[in-house]
Amino acid sequence: MDSLGSKGESRIAEWLTDKDYLILEKNWRTRTGEIDIIALDKTEQTSSGGILVFIEVKTLLKTELSDLDLIINKKKQERIIKTAKHFLANNRKYNKMYIRFDVIVLRSNPFLEQPLEILHLKDAFGDCYD
């Protein structure tokens, strides 16, 4: 049976597809970490095409949304940035694209029947070139 987090990630991948994102990878892993979703945001065009987005998905159960640091701390942000660098090293065709790090919070009940709220924090943290 899928975990709550996996179900939440699947729900968010569908939601992103409906919002004109192209999902490139789900649960992309290296020894440095994992990125929940890697997608192209086709809604925002740049000179090099769409925007390459590294997305961390958090599924919360009926809790209040508050400080971003409680949702994704600095250490987790650094791990995602490091993993994104590995993705770019292995997928050079994306190297000239604008890069964004997003956090999407799905607040729901335990069965994910009705999402109470989806909060999409674009450019939530980091910069791949720090």
Curated annotation (Swiss-Prot):
UniProt GO molecular function: nucleic acid binding
Spans traversing the lipid bilayer: none
One Pfam family this sequence matches: UPF0102
NCBIfam families for this protein: YraN family protein
Similarity remark: Belongs to the UPF0102 family.
Name under which the protein is recorded: UPF0102 protein TDE_2303
Organism: Treponema denticola (strain ATCC 35405 / DSM 14222 / CIP 103919 / JCM 8153 / KCTC 15104)
Phylogenetic classification of the source organism: Bacteria, Pseudomonadati, Spirochaetota, Spirochaetia, Spirochaetales
